[in-house]
């Protein structure tokens, strides 16, 4: 979530993505095997989505490659940690804030403070959805993007 939506700041000094990047750098060399072994797939995805068993090989492969190549979130983490939104988002900028009701990475109780989102934003909670909506509902993701874009025209 944008740092401005956190109720509480995370207790960690380093972002959780650091663990994911290390795991991805190792597992990229045996992705097909890791995907087929439930315990290994669970290590990579169970903390992100309750629907981890349903993830396609393509989604897992793409996420492993992206995390393995990632430079990380440290610059953003250092810049945003402990901050709130500091400027007004003009109403002409249409935006939607989308969370899954099963988001284990950014749960509602610590990371979804609706009161600090721009007043004109659409707050959308997707049922039976985890942190990465495009993994669980790719068609709905496209639909939400199109709806938000149409609001701007």
Q: Model regions: which residues?
A:
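Catalytic active-site module of serine/aspartate enzymes centered on a nucleophile-bearing elbow/loop
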Residues: 119-153
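Generic structural signal for small/hydrophobic residues in well-ordered secondary structure
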Residues: 1, 44, 97-100
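Conserved alpha/beta-hydrolase catalytic His-Asp/Glu region
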Residues: 32-89
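Short aromatic-enriched loop/helix-cap "lid" or pocket-rim segments at secondary-structure transitions
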Residues: 8-13, 108-111, 136-138
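Flexible "cap/lid" loop of the alpha/beta hydrolase fold
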Residues: 1-29
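Conserved serine/cysteine hydrolase catalytic core
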Residues: 69-116, 125
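Alpha/beta-hydrolase active-site loop signature
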Residues: 4, 103, 130-133
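Short helix-to-loop capping/linker segments positioned immediately adjacent to catalytic or ligand/cofactor-binding
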Residues: 29-34, 118
């Amino acid at each position: 979530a944008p740092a401005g939506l956190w109720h509480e700041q995370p207790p960690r000094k380093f972002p959780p993505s650091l663990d994911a990047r290390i795991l991805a750098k190792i597992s990229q060399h045996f992705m097909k095997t890791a995907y087929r072994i439930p315990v290994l797939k669970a290590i990579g995805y169970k903390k992100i989505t309750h629907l981890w068993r349903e993830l396609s090989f393509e989604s897992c492969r793409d996420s492993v490659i992206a995390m393995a190549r990632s430079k990380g979130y440290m610059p953003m983490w250092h810049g945003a940690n402990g901050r709130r939104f500091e400027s007004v988002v003009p109403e002409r900028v249409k935006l939607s804030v989308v969370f899954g009701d099963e988001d284990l990475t950014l749960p509602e109780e610590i990371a979804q403070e609706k009161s600090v989102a721009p007043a004109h934003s659409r707050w959308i909670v997707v049922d039976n959805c985890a942190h990465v909506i495009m993994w669980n509902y790719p068609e709905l993701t496209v639909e939400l993007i199109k709806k938000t874009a149409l609001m701007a025209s």
